[in-house]
Amino acid sequence: MSQTNSAAPAAAQAAPAATAQEAHELLREVVQGRRLSREQASAVFAALGAGELSEVETAALLAALHARGEEPQEVAGAASAFRQAARDFPSVSFPLVDVVGTGGDGVGTINISTGAGLVAASLGVAVAKHGNRAVSSKTGAADVIAELGLPLDVEPATAVELLARDHFTFLFAQAYHPAMRHVAPVRKALATPTIFNVLGPLVNPAHLTFQLMGVWDPGMLDMIAEAMVQLGRE
């Protein structure tokens, strides 16, 4: 479980979006197997979110990163870029928790983090559940929420009211991160884990106090832990 350090506003550390030419140069670096700094990763993912990369270029970026293995500073930089571009979410006066997983195990499992979050909420824990539809599994958090008949796109003010009253709200990644619309078709077509499996849990727009995160690959634990530290979480 990770605790957020509010003294380190990671979103404010995002680099400006790279120009189309700069983004293409950084893409070539990744395809050639080179590592990006946090600032470079932030810039290229800000450009991706702004629609500067084509679907083919986006697929090449995601595939190349996954093939050689994402680095902590690359994940932190990409997360900073998307948090910077996210829809604002109000601060609250009570502790917030998210129960989330990376997904991406590739064996068609079902989503259990949403159920775990609802159980926690029934015990009085305020859960700001952030999630999306399934990419490589049978169900994602958003699929579960929709099946339960709950609304996917809730206004931030309403979400805060639900947290105070019911101890649970769902923050749909596509609604809070409009920049992700540029990558959703590519992720669906690739149907394989990408950096976005890690980014999803790290870009919750709510100001979390604690986060419980499941990781499908034990080999990624150290990398994700280091990325979380770089994002100011304890």
Regions found by a protein language model. Give the residues of each.
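A glycine-rich phosphate/pyrophosphate-binding beta-strand-loop-alpha-helix module
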Residues: 62, 110-166
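Phosphate/diphosphate-binding glycine-rich loops and adjacent basic-rich segments that engage nucleotide
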Residues: 158-215, 225
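Structural motif
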Residues: 60, 95-98, 125-128, 143, ...
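Acidic, glycine/proline-rich low-complexity segments that act as flexible tails and inter-domain linkers
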Residues: 2-108, 123
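Amphipathic alpha-helical transducer elements in NTP-driven molecular machines
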Residues: 156, 218-221
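Acidic, glycine-rich active-site loops and adjacent beta-strand->loop/helix elements
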Residues: 101-106, 131-137, 176
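Oxyanion-binding "anion nests"
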Residues: 222-234
